[in-house]
Amino acid sequence: MAVNVSRVIKTLGDDFTVIDASGHILGRLSSKIAKRLLNGERIVVVNAEKAVITGDKYMVFERYKEKYDRGSKEKGPYFPRHPERIFKRTVRGMLPWKSSRGRDAYRRLRVFMGVPEELQGREFEKIEDALLEKVSKTDKYVTLAEVSRYLGFRGV
C-alpha cells in the first residue's frame, strides 16, 4: 500500500512537529506524544521502526505475538504487524479513544517508516525523557522492526 506522503502532510497544514523515534523507548515516547496531541498539537513521527521496547527479547516477542493471535479473522480484535501501525496503536491506547476528543487527537498524528523525501530538510525533535541512552541503562531491548518481523511483516 503506497502512501501519498505529500497529500498526507498537506492535510496537517504548516504548523506540525516532526519527531524522530529512533533510539526512543516506545511507551515513554507514546505517552509524551499522546499528551501533546490532546493539547491540540499536530505531530509527525519518522523512523518508527527504530523505536525500542525494553525487556528480554523473547518475552517482548511473546507479549506481542499473544496480542496478535488474540483476535480471529472474522471478529477481531485486529492487531497490526506494520511497525508504524504498532506505533500508532500504542499511542491510541494512551488516548481516550471512545470520546470524540481522543479520536480528534488521534487524527492529528502521522507516523512513517524511515524519513519521507518531503521531510528530509526539516529539523527533527528528540524527546529527552524518552531516549533509551538517557533513561535506561539496560542492554535488553528490541526494536519495533524486529517485533514486526517476528509477527510476520516482510517489509522491514
Curated annotation (Swiss-Prot):
PANTHER family in UniProt: LARGE RIBOSOMAL SUBUNIT PROTEIN UL13, RIBOSOMAL PROTEIN L13
Domain of life the protein comes from: Archaea
Species classification: Archaea, Methanobacteriati, Methanobacteriota, Archaeoglobi, Archaeoglobales
A Pfam family it matches: Ribosomal_L13
Its job: This protein is one of the early assembly proteins of the 50S ribosomal subunit, although it is not seen to bind rRNA by itself. It is important during the early stages of 50S assembly.
Organism (species): Archaeoglobus fulgidus (strain ATCC 49558 / DSM 4304 / JCM 9628 / NBRC 100126 / VC-16)
UniProt-listed InterPro entries: Ribosomal_uL13, Ribosomal_uL13_bac-type, Ribosomal_uL13_CS, Ribosomal_uL13_euk/arc, Ribosomal_uL13_sf
CDD domains the UniProt entry points to: Ribosomal_L13
Protein name: Large ribosomal subunit protein uL13
HAMAP family: Ribosomal_uL13 (MF_01366)
Cellular component annotations (GO), alphabetically ordered: cytosolic large ribosomal subunit
SUPFAM superfamilies found in the cross-reference section: Ribosomal protein L13 (SSF52161)
GO biological process: negative regulation of translation; translation
Gene behind this protein: rpl13
Record GO terms (molecular function): mRNA binding; structural constituent of ribosome
Keywords assigned: Ribonucleoprotein, Ribosomal protein
